[in-house]
């Protein structure tokens, strides 16, 4: 399993701007992981024409070499919004297709974090999980076909 972690993903001013964006954007209930009939939280969908979409695409390509293929397109950007005690489900972000690569980039825009806040991301292995803390301004890039889940 290849998980690439980058701390201090955005410059400080852009990190603060990203935090302000997600803090003030309207979230909608109904985001689901694997089963549409079992929503796991809310989300903020970001449009391709939004400046933040274009900026994040550029920075992700600069920071993660596997995204530098000129034919590779960012197809969806959204913000997960979980409230305490919500139960995200195990899921994959893309179904495996031979000859087609798919990547997910998780970004944590919050300004501070305490271990009792939760918010960990777990990645499935055969007999265990690998967990990552949601450190502020951290990004994780991984194969979109890897099973993963968050904790609220």
What residue spans do the PLM features occupy?
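Non-heme Fe(II)/2-oxoglutarate
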Residues: 1-72
């Amino acid at each position: 399993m290849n998980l690439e972690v980058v701390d201090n993903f955005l410059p400080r001013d852009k990190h603060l701007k990203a935090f302000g964006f997600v803090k003030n954007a309207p979230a909608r209930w109904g985001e689901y992981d694997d089963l549409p009939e079992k929503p796991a939280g809310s989300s903020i969908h970001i449009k391709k024409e939004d400046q933040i979409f274009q900026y994040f695409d550029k920075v992700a390509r600069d920071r993660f070499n596997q995204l530098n293929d000129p034919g590779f397109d960012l197809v969806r950007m959204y913000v997960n919004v979980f409230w305490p005690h919500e139960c995200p489900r195990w899921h994959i972000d893309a179904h495996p297709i031979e000859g087609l690569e798919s990547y997910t980039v998780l970004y944590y825009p919050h300004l501070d974090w305490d271990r009792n806040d939760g918010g960990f991301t777990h990645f499935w292995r055969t007999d265990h999980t690998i967990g990552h803390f949601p450190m502020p301004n951290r990004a994780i890039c991984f194969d979109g076909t890897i099973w993963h889940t968050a904790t609220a």
